[in-house]
């Protein structure tokens, strides 16, 4: 140094004397004591500058590389360790360039030097902030390992240091995996066994940051495959047996792509086939093209070559399919990369920072530039991770590192200016076109920026939640966008920076009671609620709240299990009222509510002036009547999701965004459902012939005082379009259950065509799926229809054998004068207008099997066995038209609006409510049913899906019976109404359907339909003769009948009139 630098009264020579004292110390402890004295000296002034300008660090480096004195090398390492440990952050800026010197000391012959080097490396690692690990430490270690002149003990130390980062800085490791994997993989094949073993251990540690649950079980085999290429084939087979359903991010790709690339270079056609399938499946699960930007270029050339040159046609086809998927992802990534405005903004901000600092600092520019580079790298890392915590940008980064150069006040100004510029740029880049900037002078409840993710999927990215007291917000967006997840996150206080429960109290209201079987009395259920007990809500207050929503004193003593879906929802609302929430979160509140109760709910919500409501509902009229504002899930330029705010109800929102018209018109939708044609029913030539009929049926639930159904007679044909209407608890769902055989009436009969297949979607539709949440939708259908019959039907309560049924099998029946015992029904064939069944008799070989008519079996009490056999035969007949293979199942799901990738790869547990309903609808249609029974089908479906379902039902040729409180849906589809009240059913004839609900039918189309309905087919000459002959036969039969038999008005049948 040419001039002395003053440090709190010390000249440069004094610093160098202390350095010499450190080097001359006789013991390790003495070295440490001198090191502490030196650290104290520098901490009193400006360590970022003085450590370098005094020559202290250069002196330590010279001592560390002194080949003649082991004492000096040990003292230098102790000096590094002690000074780093005592100075801490931000001194790492000037110490990081000396990391190679510290690592070199791991190869020293002296054990004490190696131990001191270990202390120095650990001290440096401990003082590094998280951002520096990614921006400086990992690149330094990779560069160090790539240096072929480095001795093997130092490389082992560097590998161990890298491996330790997986636990201390997992995010930094995950972000840098694309560069780490190739570096460590090369070291795994080093000729020095010590380096190879250390690299394998390091790789296992690094791979522990992978969070993909599909890949985690395979990590040991994947690492072993990297180390031992001969295990490649076994590894690929192991991967091919895995169903990938979790989101695939860059860290998982970093591990898999090197192995896939090597597999794509093999000659084995079987291995190539498996590899392209894995590649295709993985790429479909990459949510963001940026995640794959470092890997796609590596795979595309190999997959393209296989698509053109593979020997097997199947492999070429699979490779072509995978190439299409890769190209789509690559195109999206290229489009995003083409927009380099972010890089330009960062470069501009760093240039501005550099100019401002260099203009106002007296520190040598070489040193100042090294500190500025460090700060710029850290700022860029914060920006790329979307971290806009102003304190981190200014106090914890800008002021901390720049104040030694320009003073604290100016450093704060510079860093704040950079933060404001980049934050404003980020907001403009991620802004949503058309979002209304609401300025409301009312009490503000919540105003916070946040992001929302579900599993590995980003639903909302750096958006704003802005709520005012007394406003009622309708949250709208397509199925699966995350509406219910947002409400749950708010209810659980998991939204970033959301006010605490002491400031803002939230209450989530959903269908959580559905499907529960509890015998607790309704009043006890509410009074013993844990949340209400903590609020000291009295039993009388609970009773009053229940009474306010319609529960009489008598009803409050009934068990919860006796309530219909609508009454359970009202029970939830009563609990919410008692919690006195500031924010009421309503997820599909109108599901299962009848018209009267919906009107009550509308009146209640609009009367609450101090409660803010967030409502997710697919009932457009409800949102119109209740909402003061609309929150819309908006797509933006870079495919992130934001919340857009619009004043007014749904009608006002549609005026601003015409593309949202599907909220009003059923066919103004982008979603299309196509139902498979119904199967042929043997012996049914007319669409008006009854195929399912209930006669004088009555049903009472166990322990219930009143009949749910009382002497009901109804019938259905292939042309039926029936809506079952009535208040909550009237018995609508019970009517359906009795009609389709879910339960057996205590009085009366139910006739069902033996070959009739019924597709049934229950009110609690999810109960079909509750036992299969780990399966994908495709796997669920494969399970349900494996073996040639519908397992859901065979598992119904009405199909399970009771003790009485088992006793029935032990009874003998008389056939052809002989008493025999039925062992099984094994066949069926037509017998006149009925059927006869082949019986295997107990204790007799098959050659003694006989055919017994359906009527005899029913008279002898074998109804359940006959019905089960009919169900099996009809299901087998329907499944004869389909192959239970993944390709057909995928196409079937796509026909009902569920994307094929979700059907193949997503577990049912991860699906939204609307997607689960689509799974249930698709599953019940798989065996081509002739009758579709829908209990509340509109629940959980968004407007697009609702429109698609309505059009599919309209165009379907089978019979349909449904329960729905959605008047718009019912009036558009069902000309026949059955009104249920107090167990009685009143049929109201066929009224005209409201075709105005469908925009895709023009006036010309409607005239064609009308003409088609009225046009009668002209009979041929032979058909006229046959008609007259049948009439004469009927007349002769009447003449031969007993005296007094009433003469028919006509001898022609109804079909022949």
From Swiss-Prot:
Q: What does it do? A: Has a direct role in the mRNA export process. Appears to act within the rae1 mediated mRNA export pathway.
Q: One Pfam family this chain carries? A: Chromo
Positions of ATP 2 binding: 726-733
Gene assigned in the entry: elf1
What compartments host this protein? Cytoplasm; Nucleus
Q: Which residues form the ABC transporter domain?
A: 440-659, 692-1019
Phosphoserine modification sites are 733, 1041, 1053
Positions of region (Disordered): 1020-1057
Q: Which residue numbers delimit the Chromo domain? A: 820-869
SUPFAM superfamilies (UniProt xref): ARM repeat (SSF48371), P-loop containing nucleoside triphosphate hydrolases (SSF52540)
Q: Which family, according to UniProt?
A: Belongs to the ABC transporter superfamily. ABCF family. EF3 subfamily.
Q: Which GO terms describe its cellular component?
A: cytoplasm; cytosol; nucleus
Membrane as a keyword of this entry, yes or no, is no
- Example GO molecular function: ATP binding
Give the protein name, as stated in the record.
mRNA export factor elf1
Q: Where is the composition biased (Basic and acidic residues)?
A: 1020-1036
Q: Where does ATP 1 bind?
A: 477-484
Which PANTHER family does the protein's record reference? Answer: ATP-BINDING CASSETTE SUB-FAMILY F MEMBER 1 (PTHR19211:SF14), ATP-BINDING TRANSPORT PROTEIN-RELATED (PTHR19211)
């Amino acid at each position: 140094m040419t001039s002395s630098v003053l440090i709190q009264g010390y000249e440069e020579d004094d610093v160098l004397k202390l350095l010499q004292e450190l080097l001359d110390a006789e013991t390790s402890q003495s070295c440490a004591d001198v090191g502490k004295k030196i650290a104290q000296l520098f901490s009193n002034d400006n360590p970022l500058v003085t450590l370098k300008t005094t020559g202290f660090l250069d002196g330590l480096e010279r001592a560390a590389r002194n080949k003649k004195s082991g004492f000096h090398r040990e003292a230098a390492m102790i000096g590094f360790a002690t000074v780093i440990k005592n100075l801490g952050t931000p001194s790492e800026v000037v110490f990081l360039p000396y990391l190679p010197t510290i690592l070199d000391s791991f190869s020293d012959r002296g054990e004490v030097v190696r131990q001191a080097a270990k202390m120095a490396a650990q001290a440096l690692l401990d003082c590094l902030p998280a951002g520096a690990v990614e921006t400086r430490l990992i690149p330094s270690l990779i560069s160090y390992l790539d240096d072929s002149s480095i001795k093997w003990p130092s490389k082992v130390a560097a590998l161990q240091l890298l491996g330790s980062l997986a636990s201390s800085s997992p995010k930094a490791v995950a972000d840098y995996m694309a560069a780490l994997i190739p570096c460590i993989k090369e070291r795994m094949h080093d000729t020095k066994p010590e380096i190879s073993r250390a690299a394998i251990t390091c790789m296992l540690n690094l791979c522990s940051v992978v969070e993909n649950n599909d890949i985690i079980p395979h990590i040991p085999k994947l690492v072993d495959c990297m180390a031992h290429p001969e295990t490649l084939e076994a590894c690929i087979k192991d991967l091919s047996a895995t169903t990938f359903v979790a989101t695939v991010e860059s860290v998982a790709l970093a591990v898999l792509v090197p192995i896939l690339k090597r597999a794509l270079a093999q000659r084995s056609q079987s291995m190539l086939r498996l590899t392209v399938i894995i590649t295709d499946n993985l790429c479909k699960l990459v949510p963001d093209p940026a995640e794959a930007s470092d890997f796609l270029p590596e795979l595309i050339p190999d997959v393209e070559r296989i698509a053109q040159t593979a020997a097997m046609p199947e492999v070429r086809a699979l490779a072509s399919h995978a190439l299409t998927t890769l190209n789509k992802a690559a195109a999206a990534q290229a489009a995003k990369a083409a927009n380099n405005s972010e890089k330009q903004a960062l470069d501009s901000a760093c240039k501005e920072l550099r100019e401002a600092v260099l203009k106002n600092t007296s520190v040598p520019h070489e040193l100042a530039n090294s500190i500025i580079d460090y700060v710029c790298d850290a700022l860029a890392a914060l920006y790329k991770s979307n971290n806009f915590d102003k304190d981190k940008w200014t106090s914890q980064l800008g002021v901390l590192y720049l104040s030694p150069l320009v003073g604290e006040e100016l450093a704060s100004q510079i860093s704040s200016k950079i933060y404001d510029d980049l934050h404003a740029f980020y907001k403009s880049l991620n802004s949503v076109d058309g979002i209304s900037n609401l300025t409301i002078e009312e009490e503000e409840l919540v105003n916070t920026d946040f992001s929302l993710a579900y599993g590995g999927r980003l639903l909302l990215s750096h958006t704003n939640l802005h709520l005012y007291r007394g406003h009622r917000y309708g949250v709208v967006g397509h199925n699966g966008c995350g509406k219910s997840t947002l409400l749950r996150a708010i209810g659980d206080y998991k939204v970033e920076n959301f006010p605490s429960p002491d400031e803002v109290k939230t209450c989530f209201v959903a269908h959580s009671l559905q499907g529960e079987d509890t015998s607790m009395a309704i009043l006890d259920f509410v009074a013993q609620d844990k949340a209400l007990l903590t609020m000291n809500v009295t039993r009388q207050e609970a009773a009053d709240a229940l009474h306010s929503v319609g529960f009489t004193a008598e009803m409050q003593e009934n068990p919860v299990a006796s309530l219909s879906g609508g009454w359970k929802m009202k029970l939830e609302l009563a609990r919410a009222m008692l919690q006195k929430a500031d924010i009421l979160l309503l997820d599909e509140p109108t599901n299962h509510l009848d018209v009267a109760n919906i009107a009550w709910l509308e009146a209640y919500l609009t009367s609450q002036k101090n409660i803010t409501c967030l409502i997710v509902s697919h009932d457009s009229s409800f949102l119109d009547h209740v909402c003061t504002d609309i929150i819309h899930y908006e797509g933006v330029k870079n495919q992130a999701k934001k919340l857009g705010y619009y004043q007014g109800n749904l009608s006002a929102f549609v005026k601003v965004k015409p593309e949202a018209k599907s909220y009003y018109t059923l066919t103004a939708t982008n979603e299309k459902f196509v139902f498979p044609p119904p199967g042929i029913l043997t012996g049914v030539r007319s669409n008006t012939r009854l195929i399912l009929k209930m006669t004088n049926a009555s049903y009472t639930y166990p322990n219930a005082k009143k009949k749910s159904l009382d002497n009901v007679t109804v019938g259905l044909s292939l042309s039926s379009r029936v809506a079952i209407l009535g208040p909550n608890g009237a018995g609508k769902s019970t009517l359906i259950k009795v009609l389709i055989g879910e339960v057996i009436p205590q009085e009366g009969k139910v006739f069902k065509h033996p070959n009739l297949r019924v597709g049934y979607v229950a009110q609690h539709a999810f109960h079909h799926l509750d036992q299969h949440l780990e399966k994908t939708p495709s796997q669920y259908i494969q399970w349900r229809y494996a073996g040639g019959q519908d397992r859901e039907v065979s598992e119904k309560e009405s199909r399970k054998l009771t003790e009485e049924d088992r006793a029935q099998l032990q009874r003998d029946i008389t056939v052809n004068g002989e008493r025999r015992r039925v062992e099984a029904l094994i066949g069926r064939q037509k017998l006149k207008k009925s059927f006869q069944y082949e019986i295997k008799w107990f204790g007799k070989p098959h050659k003694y099997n006989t055919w017994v008519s359906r009527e005899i079996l029913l008279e002898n009490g074998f109804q359940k066995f006959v019905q089960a056999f009919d169900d099996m035969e009809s299901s087998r007949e329907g499944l004869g038209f389909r192959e239970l293979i993944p390709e057909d199942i995928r196409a079937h799901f796509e026909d009902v609006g569920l994307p094929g990738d979700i059907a193949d790869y997503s577990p049912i547990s991860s699906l939204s409510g609307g997607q689960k309903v689509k799974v249930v609808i698709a599953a019940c249609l798989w065996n081509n049913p002739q009758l579709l029974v829908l209990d509340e089908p509109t629940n959980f479906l968004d407007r697009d899906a609702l429109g698609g379902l309505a059009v599919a039902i309209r165009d379907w040729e089978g019979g349909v019976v449904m329960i729905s409180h959605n008047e718009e849906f019912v009036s558009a589809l069902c000309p026949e109404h059955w009104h249920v009240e107090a167990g009685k059913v009143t049929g109201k004839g066929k009224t005209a359907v409201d075709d105005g609900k469908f925009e895709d039918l023009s006036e010309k189309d409607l005239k064609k339909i009308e003409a088609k309905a009225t046009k009668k087919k002209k009979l041929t000459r032979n058909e006229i003769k046959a008609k007259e002959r049948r009439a004469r036969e009927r007349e002769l039969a009447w003449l031969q009948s007993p005296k007094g038999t009433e003469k028919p008005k006509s001898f022609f049948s109804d079909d022949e009139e």
